[in-house]
Amino acid sequence: MTANDKKQLMVAACKVRMNVIKGVHAAKAGHPGGSLSAADMFTYLFCKEMKVDPKNPKWEERDRFVLSKGHTAPGLYGVLAHQGFFPEEDLLTLRQIGSHLQGHPNMNMTPGVDMSTGSLGQGISTAVGMALAAKYQGKENRVYTLLGDGEIQEGQVWEAMMAASHYKLDNLCVIIDNNGLQIDGKVADVMSPYPIPEKLQAFGFEVAEIDGHDFEQIEAAFNKARETKGKPFGIIMKTTKGKCVSFMENNAGWHGKAPNDDEYAQAISELQAQLAEVEGM
């Protein structure tokens, strides 16, 4: 990765985070914490990794993305708007009646959304089905799915993992956002899924553990995923819930709460300062 590539990704991630804050503030509802923790991954996927076309969202040869942790839709919408799938001003209609941007992704309403999700544990199952279908059809499409570490407390996740390994889905990349927090507190206290890497390996996955805010590590993991044959690939990314907004970081209270006007102003100010710093690099 060149220095300029890294800079452009960092700039994009700052803008995606601002989009998240703008959307949930306008809606007065939503899930900023997990959207911000995954913002760097959203950015890398849609700006560099995936084969997609904003002008033709239903392009048959595109790669597929399934947001299994569907409540973090503001993060997905933030990057889709940034990439031109729809106008950024649409973000201000989040969760409104008649808007194509609802609280959870809807594949029939939002350009760039490949699967309607929200019921935790089900997204990965549909991603496995997409990857298996691509294999049967002899297509080169890759399938990516993003889960939360709290989400993997759901039993259905592990049935899907078992199927992915059984069918040798090396076109599937399962990404787990390990920010350590869920709505009720620490994931380890609610129902510990740890250690995650060993569990994925036991289910037949090749695994990479990375810093989910380091673009070089993200790129290295995806390069390894493309080189892996005969088995699915899992990326466990260590992240910070509420990343880049000081009062939201590592605070489970921001799992599903919108900022008020003062908090919004502070969050945007912090992100604008970070953007200016990155652009000046």
Question: Where are the model-predicted features located?
Answer:
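N-terminal hydrophobic or amphipathic helices/low-complexity stretches enriched
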Residues: 1-16
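Short secondary-structure boundary/capping segments
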Residues: 83, 190, 249-253
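Short acidic, glycine/serine/threonine-rich loops at helix termini
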Residues: 77-78, 106, 156-158, 184-188, ...
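Cofactor-binding active-site loop characterized by glycine-rich and histidine/acidic residues
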Residues: 20-24, 35-166
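Glycine-rich beta-alpha junction loops
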Residues: 71-72, 76, 179-180, 214, ...
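Glycine/aspartate-rich loop-and-adjacent alpha/beta segment that forms the canonical ThDP
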Residues: 205, 215-281
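N-terminal capping segment at the start of a domain
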Residues: 12-29, 177-179
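Thiamine diphosphate
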Residues: 112, 116-119, 124-228
